[in-house]
Regions:
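Detector for methionine-enriched segments
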Residues: 32, 44, 62, 116, ...
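Short secondary-structure transition/capping segments
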Residues: 41-48, 67-74, 118-127, 150-161, ...
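Short, well-ordered, mixed-charge alpha-helical segments that flank or form enzyme active sites
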Residues: 54, 78-81, 115-117, 142-147
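Fold-independent oxyanion-binding glycine-rich loops
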Residues: 23-26, 46-49, 72-75, 109-112, ...
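Conformationally flexible catalytic loops at phosphate/diphosphate-handling active centers
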Residues: 131-182
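Thiamine diphosphate
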Residues: 1-97, 104, 121
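Conserved thiamine diphosphate
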Residues: 86-140, 152
């Protein structure tokens, strides 16, 4: 019910050497993202307003542990399950920190379906550069629209080195991912 992103990625990612994993719940999904990001993978998850609320604790842990990821939120306004009409509730949750703790997300807000596509690459680059979750905050109606989009020509980019990632000790001191430093 959230959006068509998982449907598309389930088909497309294996075609380009990626991996798609369907989680059993929003809470499981954000924890899978935490684990994959901690291992240095470029990783994303998507949901709508109520699902993002369920992911908030995991998002705060990721921000605290400085783990990069992309979170797509196709907004639903209002309390409970909400609706697809424009509202500010998910906006406040995204830009003011929706969970416990003192953290902020980088938030990109596309105005068109094409811009949603175009901002994905930028979101991953920003997440890696700042070691912080990045949220793409799409309007609920925008998430329901269907129109032709143009994908940029794929460019081979080398991923930023992630010496902090938990990739196995491999002749070095083990890395530890932690969101609390005493």
């Amino acid at each position: 019910p959230q959006n068509e992103i998982p449907q598309y990625l389930a088909k497309r990612l294996p075609e380009v050497g990626g991996v798609f994993v369907q989680a059993e719940s929003e809470i499981a999904a954000i924890n899978m993202v935490y684990g994959a990001a901690g291992a240095g993978a470029r990783v994303m998850t998507s949901s709508s307003g109520p699902g993002i609320s369920l992911k908030q604790e995991g998002i705060t842990y990721m921000a605290g542990a400085e783990l990069p990821c992309v979170i797509v939120n196709i907004q639903r306004g209002g309390p409970g399950l909400g609706g697809i009409q424009p509202a500010q509730s998910d906006y406040f949750q995204a830009v003011k920190g929706g969970g416990h703790g003192d953290y902020r997300l980088l938030v990109l807000a596309p105005a068109t379906v094409q811009e949603m596509v175009d901002l994905m690459e930028k979101a991953f680059d920003l997440a890696d550069e700042y070691r912080n979750p990045v949220m793409i905050l799409g309007d609920g109606i925008l998430g329901q629209m269907m129109e032709a989009v143009e994908f940029k020509e794929e460019k081979k980019t080398s991923q930023m080195e992630k010496p902090w990632a938990t990739t196995g000790a491999k002749g070095r001191k083990p890395n530890l991912i932690n969101s609390l430093f005493l």
